[in-house]
Amino acid sequence: AAEYPGYLFAAVGIQPNSAAEANETDFAVIEDLAGYPGVRAIGETGLDCYWDDTPIEMQHDYFDRHMQLCRDTALPMVIHMRESGDLIVDQLKRQTNVPPGIMHSFTGDWECANSCLDLGLHVSFAGMVTFKKSDALRDVARRIPEDRLLVETDSPYLSPEPFRGKRPNEPARVEHTLRCLAEVRGVSAKALA
């Protein structure tokens, strides 16, 4: 972001799966980086109950710390969720002031999505929504208000159909995810873009 100002932007944070490897100095670096001009968000932060690389209590602590950093800097947060939607919503509801942000690569159910919307968050979908067995996720995407819906790659992972399993995922493939979302919403990709 510093090398290409105005063209490339950054999010800074300690991803939940990496929190066990982090220390106070690392978080201080994140706090410092958050003040750089090219930084536009804090994260990924959040919770991951799929991998057991970091104890859940430590993930909760870092999630709280990231949210406080968002409040201190007025930057939005990018929330990682993997098999942790209910825990994330519960933790967000305990906040007196939920920072703005996005539910990154959303995979939860409608109840979780609706709670996130009620908390003022945007909901973002990656290639997983295009997978054949993702009917329930597509139904959630269909119900998200257009002004709160985002489309992403989650590069280098989660390439959409017809590239599923091929890595690295890349920005050019987001078109396939967009087309899928447009189809389930009954609009053209151009209109949704």
Predicted region positions:
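Mid-domain alpha/beta scaffold segments of enzyme catalytic cores
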Residues: 1-193
